[in-house]
């Protein structure tokens, strides 16, 4: 682990300690209840799954969406998403745990807390703020840390998206019996994108594992092609960059040609479910 990723994780450790002082676990742990929204079930089945992301900024792109309104975004995503991802990292992504309950209130889908999770405290905090799943990155966790964090998440009925970015991490994910494996096409060490990573790594995972392709997915053509390798996709920047969010969602998820004349979300939903 080095460069951008190492810096983010080092800063995250500082953030966690400060947040523990500001909002101790003991002050809210008794109010935490296990989730009823099943992340694993939401991504299961034969239909391509889409985790659509609420993301204001990123280290690679800077500010992505100036008029960032989580409720408005969720009100569109809820017609198309299998689950919704919410960036919670403050320093590098201008995210917030406060966005989680806003999105959860608008959309019925499971909500994924997208953060650099290194401490059980973050998982308890995520659930307190109504997240139904969390991201665990094998690039920043050793196996023992992963087991501990995964156990905390599952104790709260939360799902885990286990992220890998190379073959070594993939082998670890298999050994750790990860249920949902996200293959990150972005190299967090230098921020480069390579969609071949999904093609190369997905084939190694068995049929009992849900494979999600993450990062760098911008077009319906890419979704169509990579759907032969992955069960689903996590898409954020490609949508957040567009002023007309609904049109962007329909374009990337459904293909522009296939939704001509479909102006209402429910029409697009029907078209998608019928295989359009």
PLM region descriptions:
Residues 118-130, 165-176, 216-235, 240, ...:
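Catalytic cores of alpha/beta
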Residues 1-67:
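An N-cap/entry alpha-helix motif that binds or orients negatively charged groups
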Residues 195-205, 226-227, 239-260:
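C-terminal helical cap(s) of enzyme catalytic domains, especially alpha/beta-barrels
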Residues 49-53, 83-85, 110-112, 132-135, ...:
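Structural preference for beta-strand elements that scaffold enzyme active sites
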Residues 42-63, 96-103, 108, 147, ...:
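N-terminal small/glycine-rich loop or linker at the start of catalytic domains
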Residues 128-145, 182-192, 229-249, 276:
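Glycine-rich phosphate-binding active-site loops on the catalytic face of alpha/beta enzymes
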Residues 51-69, 110-118, 160-163, 213, ...:
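Active-site mouth loops of central-metabolism enzymes
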Residues 61-154, 169-172, 198-201, 265:
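N-terminal active-site wall of soluble small-molecule enzyme domains
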């Amino acid at each position: 682990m080095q460069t951008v990723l190492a810096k983010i994780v080092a800063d995250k450790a500082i953030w966690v300690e400060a947040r523990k002082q500001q909002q101790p676990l003991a002050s809210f742990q008794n109010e935490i209840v296990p989730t009823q929204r099943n992340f694993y079930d939401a991504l299961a089945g034969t239909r391509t799954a889409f985790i659509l992301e609420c993301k204001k900024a990123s280290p690679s792109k800077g500010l992505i969406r100036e008029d960032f309104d989580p409720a408005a975004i969720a009100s569109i995503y809820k017609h198309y998403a299998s689950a919704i991802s919410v960036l919670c990292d403050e320093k590098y992504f201008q995210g917030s745990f406060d966005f989680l309950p806003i999105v959860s209130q608008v959309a019925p889908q499971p909500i994924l807390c997208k953060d650099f999770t290194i401490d059980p405290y973050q998982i308890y905090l995520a659930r307190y703020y109504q997240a139904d799943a969390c991201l665990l990155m094998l690039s920043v966790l050793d196996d023992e840390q992963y087991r501990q964090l995964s156990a905390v998440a599952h104790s709260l009925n939360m799902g885990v998206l286990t992220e890998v970015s190379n073959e070594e991490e993939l082998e670890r994910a298999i050994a750790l019996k990860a249920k949902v494996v996200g293959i990150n096409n972005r190299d967090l060490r230098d921020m480069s994108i390579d969609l071949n990573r999904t093609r190369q790594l997905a084939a190694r995972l068995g049929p009992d594992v849900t494979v999600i392709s993450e990062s760098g997915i911008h077009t319906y053509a890419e979704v169509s092609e990579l759907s032969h390798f992955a069960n689903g996709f996590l898409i954020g920047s490609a949508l957040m960059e567009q002023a007309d969010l609904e049109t962007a969602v329909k374009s990337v998820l459904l293909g522009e040609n296939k939704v001509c004349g479909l102006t209402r979300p429910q029409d697009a939903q029907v078209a998608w479910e019928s295989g359009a």
